[in-house]
Amino acid sequence: MREIVSCQAGQCGNQIGSKFWEVIADEHGVDPTGSYQGDSDLQLERINVYFDESAGGRYVPRAVLMDLEPGTMDSVRAGPYGQLFRPDNFIFGQSGAGNNWAKGHYTEGAELIDSVLDVCRKEAESCDCLQGFQLSHSLGGGTGSGMGTLLISKLREEYPDRIMMTFSVIPSPRVSDTVVEPYNTTLSVHQLVENSDESMCIDNEALYDICFRTLKLTTPTFGDLNHLVAAVMSGVTCCLRFPGQLNSDLRNRLAVNLVPFPRLHFFMMGFAPLTSRGSQEYRQGLSVADVTQQMFDAKNMMQAADPRHGRYLTASALFRGRMSTKEVDEQMLNVQNKNSSYFIEWIPNNIKSSICDIPPKGLKMSVTFIGNNTCIQEMFRRVGEQFTGMFRRKRFLHWYTGEGMDEMEFTEAESNMNDLVSEYQQYQDATVEEEGEFDEEEEAY
């Protein structure tokens, strides 16, 4: 089996993570006590990817939960699936990181990281053939961003050949929690560029927009947002957990096909069909054409970046449900032909699709979309501008230098993010003719 160890850091990461476990436990027929109550062999066929079977036949998530304060852990434990997790895998401090990246990365987090790594090692050792790690965290706070990136770099040292995948919640342009979000985000991106293999970017504001516009909710709660994120996380990982016609694992399907240049591994995610919770009956009449159409719709993207402002380097569509491969291929070709200007022409076959036979609960079919679009630079550019505005005046810098950080680190992180933006821009503007010119120049020397 190709197992995945799932880590969740900080308040946001733990809330998204625990929602994700609720969704996939439900899909695999595992009840809140960890015993199997399902009705299909397909649920058990690859259940070991995320669950470890204990001696008594209970299924225990391969999950590592960490935070620098006990509050979130208590609420996860008290939640509906709190008894599912292995009690030793809750690792928490008492002090909190106070939205300070330096505390999470250098001081408080560094004290706790060894016990987290011990649990990760234990989980990795119980795997037959570890495929990689996934981390859910936010980049705006202190623990998820600082300690989350610390964990990634430590795991990178210890397991250099395993895939590292992150679900990263990026601060929104209009919805801001703390004033130092731009600092925390930039310092985190600086780490993710170097140490993660694929980062799925999620944005609260885009999630709010989906709730208002598409789902017609008047007062969306964080529960609703987490529900959306969990649906996408479940969709991204479904072809690893269930048998299907065109199946895949993290490395082949996602990392190899979606990352044309190693630094450009920040993806947008989308999901279809998105209908409000009440209108179940409408969902049954969906066709492959409908969901494909909806999937490429800018309103369904979970990031505050508009794919129409950029171009797709690569994309992957993960269909779920009973459908023919031929129909899927036709629809995907159809989309590419109609909107050819949005796809980069110098990467051949840059849209991949896979089909997993088992649809999510309550739907006949669904599709999850992962796109590597150059428009994600808008997000980095926005954070970069906020960062520069604060850093130029050295606002709040003493919080970080007081924890032993150096101003040089800020300058490095800033320039790394600016480089990332210009790399995206460069590939967005590149055309086939230019590629030809480069060859001629090389021959001339």
Swiss-Prot record:
Pfam families: Tubulin, Tubulin_C. It is found in: Cytoplasm, Cytoskeleton. GTP binds at Q11, E69, S138, G142, T143, G144, N204, N226. Its main location: cytoplasm. Its cofactor is Mg(2+). GO terms for biological process: microtubule-based process. The keyword Nucleus does not apply. GO terms for cellular component: cytoplasm; microtubule. This is Tubulin beta chain. It comes from Leishmania mexicana.
